[in-house]
Amino acid sequence: MRYLLLTLLLFTVPAQAQTTLRLSGLTGELEANVQRYLDRYAATEISTSLRFQSRLEQDIGTALQALGYYHSEIDISLQRNGHNGSRLLIRVTPGEPTRIKETDLQILGDAQNDADFLVLLAQAPQAGDIVHHGRYDSFKAALNSLAQRKGYFDARFSLQRLEVAPSRREAFVRLHFDSGTRYRFGRVSFSGQQIASDRLQSLVPFQAGAPYLASQLGELNQALANTNWFSSILVTADTEEITEHTLPINIELAPRKRNSIETGIGYSDDVGARLKLNWLKPWLNERGHSLNTKLAISGAEQSVEAAYKLPLQSVATDFWQLQYGLRNRDYQDTRAIESNLALERHWLLANDWYRTASIRWLYEDYTQADQEDSSSLLMPGISFSRSRQSGSGMPRQADRLLLGIEVSDPSWGSDASFVRLRGRAGYIDSFGDRHRMVSRLDAGAILMETVENLPPSLRFFAGGDNNLRGYAYESVSPLNQQGELIGGRYMATASLEYQYRVTGNWWLATFADYGSAWTDSPDWKRGVGFGVRWGSPIGAVRIDFAWGLDAEGSPFQLHFSLGPEL
């Protein structure tokens, strides 16, 4: 019976009423900083005791003084809510702020004439500013950070003082920053590499004796990673060998495996399942030659391609590439076997532009609608391209541009005379953390009277995952009298897509596509729909449900794709 009575008593004891806080009288940064202090209290710490109220006043005063308000008035009153607990009402009047009356800012040592330090000095606390302890500390941290990035490794404050006279509402900032001597790059040594040292030295973006700059070590690390030659890269400064403020750089490398095989799978309502195999030999010899072989198989198309890359002395910017590809296509009204052999010369230009000069031989045996023929073409060409992005998977910002031209003429052995132009553009931008816009343009033109003498691979078709959603793969083009696709002289498509982040790397998308492929006059097609995006480490996984508003037959298409969005 005693146990039953004890249990009943336990269940009838009322829960302890809690005390809450309510702040008023402040706005903006003052309110936010005080609220940060208040948010540190656990619910069990808050009480109506005079001891807690005294602590509360102290903390609020500290929060306001950090922003230059030393003469605040804090009024705390108690509001009881019956059995629902009580509330402390905190009314704050910040008062007049304390301002900086005088500053004494000096840069000493080699940095006194450094342009970056002069720019940073312009961001220092100035006379007339409200005292802000956070900005004062941030400015000191910025000086130290800049010094480390630019090689002033002996930098120190010979004087650092923030003097506040609350009674006079005045403050004085005194900072003397002695940078000392700026260090310089010494020799760069590689170890563990399988590539000739002279090739690696061409990647070094600085000369021995040049002023130290941390960003250039980052550039060197990225350039080494971009070669695909190494599985690990460790860049360190040899502090034991410093002489006369010269800093040697040691780079420890580990070779990448000689063979790398990647597989992939995809599906779309256009061509069904797609299988991909990529066999990469990232380095074949000490000169850094590489071989990349790709195999792609779907119901509509099977292809194999091999590319042999020969870096030149400037490894990061110049290389030759010999390429051969074989492709079989059987889809819609196209049946073709094509063989491509190309020799390309690549240059990296300023502002991330690539220039590629090429000469390509194409032999294609084909049936396009009711036309059966074969073609042998020798086409010199040149293209300019640029691709940039910030982040991976689903980059916050990205842009891609491509402009290219190929020319063919019987005077050098081709079966036809024409000029073929191609252009692509894409742009990604983000707004906040949840909104993205993706836009794409794709266009092409063939300068000749008729495309009947051209193989299908050079004619233009529209429709598919990355071109004109809502229409089957390459299903939009001029038709012959039997209603069969024959390809066009021109093509233009545009896409605008909005994405909303649902959670993590998952996004919802809605889009509208517009475009056509034509010879005489365009028959514009519209496609709309929605989709799901997942930002995987290797690129966006995209599933789209699309409707062709001008499609004949079934207007619905399911599109699935994996990889970069542009």
Segments predicted by a language model, with ranges:
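N-terminal signal peptide c-region/cleavage motif recognized by signal peptidases
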Residues: 12-14
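Gram-negative/organellar outer-membrane beta-barrel architecture
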Residues: 110-116, 213-402, 429, 437, ...
